[in-house]
Amino acid sequence: METLLSFDEIKKIIPHRYPFLLIDRITELEEGKRCTGIKQVSGNEPFFQGHFPEYAVMPGVLIVEALAQVGAVAMLKLEENQGKLAMFTGIDKCRFKSQVTPGDTLTLSVEMTRVKGPIGKGTATAKVGDKLACSCEISFAIIEK
């Protein structure tokens, strides 16, 4: 997969930093409409120290956060939203279908389904290969810093 936005370019768009920046690169982007990002899940992730020490599994809430970050990139790349913040305002219909473990490549896709002014909603999926790990609907608001 081609890299459209590198890790350093992502950091220019969203404010998240280690250990909470959960996307490594963007591979597809249609500003304001859809975005796909990649997270290479390493055994060195700080959350694996406690979740779970004997059986490392990426917490579902962090998969959802990674999806929200991909959605934020899609919306904040729009010229009128540059320099603003994307706030995660809700989650609906969330389902976790399979575990994400060290060594996995997590493909995170978000497609906006409704955007009205600074508020919107999108459908999101996280996959490891062809296997669905998580699906949900995420809501957001774009605000001034």
Swiss-Prot record:
UniProt protein name: 3-hydroxyacyl-[acyl-carrier-protein] dehydratase FabZ
Task: Give start-end ranges for the coiled-coil region(s).
Answer: none
Biological processes per GO annotation: fatty acid biosynthetic process; lipid A biosynthetic process
One GO MF term, please?
Answer: (3R)-hydroxyacyl-[acyl-carrier-protein] dehydratase activity
Function, as annotated, reads:
Involved in unsaturated fatty acids biosynthesis. Catalyzes the dehydration of short chain beta-hydroxyacyl-ACPs and long chain saturated and unsaturated beta-hydroxyacyl-ACPs.
What this protein catalyses is: a (3R)-hydroxyacyl-[ACP] = a (2E)-enoyl-[ACP] + H2O
For the keyword Amino-acid biosynthesis, the answer is no
Which keywords label this protein? Cytoplasm, Lipid A biosynthesis, Lipid biosynthesis, Lipid metabolism, Lyase
Task: Name the residues annotated as catalytic in the UniProt entry.
Answer: 51
Q: Name one GO cellular component term.
A: membrane
Q: Which family does it belong to?
A: Belongs to the thioester dehydratase family. FabZ subfamily.
Q: What is its EC number?
A: 4.2.1.59
Q: Which subcellular locations apply to this protein?
A: Cytoplasm
What superkingdom heads the lineage?
A: Bacteria
